[in-house]
Amino acid sequence: MTDNQQQRYRFSEAPIWNLNRSYYEEEGLKAWNNDQVPQYITSNPMIATAYAEMIFGLLQDQANKGNNTEPVVIVELGAGAGRLAYHVLVELCKLRDFASITLPPFRYVMTDLAMNNVIAWKEHPALQDFIAEGIVDFAKFDAVNDTELNLVASNITIGAGELQQPLIIVANYFFDGIPQELLYVGDGHIYEADVFVDYPEQADSLKPSEVLDQLSLRYEYRLAPEYEQEDFAYRNVIATYQEQLEDSHILWPSSGLKCLERLNQLTQSGFVLITADKGDNLLDSFKFAEPPELVLHGAFSFTANYHAFVQAYEESGAMVLFPPHHYKNLNVGCFLNVDMPKSYTNTRLAYHRFVERFGPEEFFSLKEWVDRRIDTMGIQQILSFWRLGGYDAEFFIQSARQISSLLPDANDEELADLASGIQIMWSSYYVMEQKYDLALDAGLILFEMDMYEQSKYFLEISINSDEDEIVSTVYYGLAVCCFEMELAEEGLEYTKKLLELEPDNEDAMAIIHSFE
C-alpha cells in the first residue's frame, strides 16, 4: 500500500491504542502471569508499604482536622493483577490496628478497563476478609470516558460531588499506556505528529501482542495552532515547551489530564495522587527528544510525561513531590491537589521517609544487584534483605537454593527467624498464576530444618494446588513428616503415592513391607 493510500491518524486515535485495550481485555489477569506485563516493581511489599504509609498519613491529617466521619476513598487506576491493592490493604490495616487512634473510615476501590479482571478480584480468596469488612470494592472504569464509579461489591455509585473527603488516586504504570498526543516543538511552534501504521502481513489473524510486536510507525507533522491559543486549558505548559525546547518530541498526556479532571469532579475536597511510572518530571529530559518508541511487554507503553502534570497542578496551587535525584527504573510522585497542601503534614512526612529518602526505586535497584549475588550471601544478609523487602515471596523463591545450602551451618536463632519469616511471608501472600510454587519451596526448606509439622502444612498446600505436576520428592517429604509426627496411617498413604510415581523406590518399598 502506498503512502497516499494509507490512513493518517492523530496519535491519540491511532489503532495501537485499541490493540492495547484488546490485549488487556483478552488476556485478563493472565497478562501479569510470570511478568508478561511487568508488575513486580510496582506491586511488591516494599512499594505497598510506602503507599500505605502515605495513605495512613492522610488519614491522620484528616483526623487532625476533625474530619473523622466521612470515608476516604482510594481509587487505584488499572489495578492489574490486584497484588498492590492487597499488600497496601494488609499494611494499612496493620498501621490502623497498631496505632489504635481515631481515624476516618476508608475504602480501597480497585478499577480496570476489563470486567473480567473486576470479577476475578471480587472472587479472589485473599480479598474476601477485606470485602466482608467493607474496606475494598471494585469497579470497571474506562479512564478515557467514564465520569462515575459503579462499585460492584457494595452496589454503590459514586457520582459528581458525592465525596466530602479528598480522593486518593493510585496510578502505577498507568499514564504511560493510555492515549496521548505526540507533539513536536520546532522554531517556537507546536506541531502534532500524525502517524501512519505499517502492519505485518496477515495482521487480522494475529493476536494483539503479535501485531504490536511486528508493526512500525511513521510520522508526518502539521502545525497545531490550537495549543497556542490563550484559551487552551494548559496554555502555560505549552508556552514553557515553546520557550525552552527546540527540535523536541513530547508526549502530551491528554487522556491522563482529562481523567484526573473527571475524578476530581467526584469530590468536594480535591485529590491526592500517588503515582509511579517510568516517567520524566524534569524538563531537561525532553530536550531534543526523538519520537518515542513502543516499549513492548505483551502490550506496550511509553515513558510518561510527568512534567506536564507537575507544571499544570503546581500552577493551580497543588504541592507536587518528586525525589530531588534522578531515577533509573521508577519515578514515584505525590500530588497534593487540595486546599492548604502544606497542612497535610503526615502525608508529606510519609513521602519523605518512605519514597524520597529510600523508596521503591532504591529498593528495586538494590534488589537487582542482590539478585546477581545471592549465591555469595550468608544467612544474615538474606534475612536482612528479606525483612527490608517486607518478607517478599519473590526474593524467597530466588534465594531458596542458597538458603538450603546454608542451613547446616545456621544456628538456632537463625533457623527460628527463617521459620518465622516464612509464616509472615505466607500470611500476606497474594496468589497469582506464576511459574514458581511458593508453598513447595517453603515446605522443602522447613523439611530440611526438621520442622515437620510446618513442612507438612506447606507441602500439602502444594500438592492440592497442582495435582498434575507433583514430584516424588514431595510425597517422600510428606511421608517422613507424618511418621515423625506419629501419623502412621497418613504416612503410609503418602508412601503408596510415592511408589505410584517411583515403583522401584527401595525406601518406600521397605516402609510398605514393614506395615504388612
Predicted regions, residues:
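Rossmann-like AdoMet/SAM-dependent catalytic core
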Residues: 243-473, 480
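Conserved SAM-binding loop of SAM-dependent methyltransferases across substrates and taxa
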Residues: 81-101
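"A position-specific structural signal for the A-helix of alpha-solenoid helical repeats
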Residues: 441, 477, 484, 510-514
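A short SAM/SAH-binding and catalytic strip from SAM-dependent methyltransferases
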Residues: 153-187, 245-258, 266, 273
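A mobile, often basic/glycine-rich helix-loop segment
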Residues: 171-224, 294-298
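S-adenosyl-L-methionine
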Residues: 118-161, 227, 234
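Conserved SAM-binding motif I beta-strand of class I
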Residues: 99-100, 105-112
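N-terminal charged/capping segments associated with class I S-adenosyl-L-methionine
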Residues: 1-71, 76, 83-86, 90, ...
